Amino acid sequence: MGDTWAQLPWPGPPHSALLLVFFLLAAGVMHSDAGASCPVLCTCRNQVVDCSNQRLFSVPPDLPMDTRNLSLAHNRIAAVPPGYLTCYMELRVLDLRNNSLMELPPGLFLHAKRLAHLDLSYNNLSHVPADMFREAHGLVHIDLSHNPWLRRVHPQAFQGLVHLRDLDLSYGGLAFLSLEALEGLPGLVTLQIGGNPWVCGCTMEPLLKWLRNRIQRCTADSQLAECRGPPEVEGAPLFSLTEESFKACHLTLTLDDYLFIAFVGFVVSIASVATNFLLGITANCCHRWSKANEEEEI
């Protein structure tokens, strides 16, 4: 019997087997911790955390550290606390659509350097500040559509987003968009701007020229982009405007115009002097007449 056991092959040094068991247990504990940290009312699987359609009023705490895809869509979330994404450096997709967000805290994406897709549509955002996407240089897609109170986009709101390909600003409250906000987006392919109350005055001309120059690379929803003002172009498609539409913005004065203005100014000056002279004479006469009446009464 002893000889039989002696002839059996030994699987290896005891310390190697112990190390193998240790690593397996450690991996199991780590996996168990990641699964155990799934928030209540959420489902967690394959680095995807789905907390959508749960009527949440606040963001869930303590997500799995390796979360790559986080959906908080279709809830009633009104605010995201500062530093909420600090620990989730693997985050690639963040879906916050259809909530009650009015603003986002500064530096929210400071540590989300791998974030590529961000959906903030169907919220109540009123403006996009300069520091909103700071450090989130990996963003490829941003959806800000259907924010009816969105009135202003800071000229440097998208600064540094060199990889951004898709930007949706449709169906908001934008009447004006600074050209500077788009010029720093070399990779932009799709831009949606329809459904906004655009004021197609002189300030719109630079943006329209830029869009026309980029139209083969930047596909804008030209059929939905309409002017809400001034009255003479109200209801006109934005891309139907031509250089003639902005002719009044480039009026130049000729020599005859300057001579006419000078003549009118001269006439007005003479009329003013004559009027002052007549008023002076009238006042003097009234004074003398009043003084004469006083002497007669005495």
Swiss-Prot record:
Q: Which GO terms describe its cellular component?
A: voltage-gated potassium channel complex
InterPro entries (alphabetical): Cys-rich_flank_reg_C, KCNMA1_auxiliary, Leu-rich_rpt, Leu-rich_rpt_typical-subtyp, LRR_dom_sf, LRRNT
Name where it mostly resides: membrane
Q: How does it sit in the membrane?
A: Single-pass membrane protein
Domain LRRNT as annotated: residue spans: 35-65
LRRCT domain segment(s): 196-251
Task: Give UniProt keywords alphabetically.
Answer: Cell membrane, Disulfide bond, Ion channel, Ion transport, Leucine-rich repeat, Membrane, Repeat, Signal, Transmembrane, Transmembrane helix, Transport
Tell me the domain of life: Eukaryota
GO biological process, alphabetically ordered: potassium ion transmembrane transport
Disulfide bond positions: 38-44, 42-51, 200-227, 202-249
UniProt keyword Methyltransferase present: no
The record's listing under SUPFAM superfamilies reads: L domain-like
The signal peptide, as residue positions, is: 1-34
Q: Where are the LRR repeats?
A: 66-87, 90-111, 114-135, 138-160, 163-186
The record's note on quaternary structure and interaction partners says: Interacts with KCNMA1.
Q: Which PANTHER family match?
A: GH08155P (PTHR46473), LEUCINE-RICH REPEAT-CONTAINING PROTEIN 55 (PTHR46473:SF5)
Q: Tell me the domain comment.
A: The transmembrane domain is necessary for interaction with KCNMA1.
Q: What is its biological role?
A: Auxiliary protein of the large-conductance, voltage and calcium-activated potassium channel (BK alpha). Modulates gating properties by producing a marked shift in the BK channel's voltage dependence of activation in the hyperpolarizing direction, and in the absence of calcium.
For this entry, the protein name equals Leucine-rich repeat-containing protein 55
Species, as recorded:
Rattus norvegicus
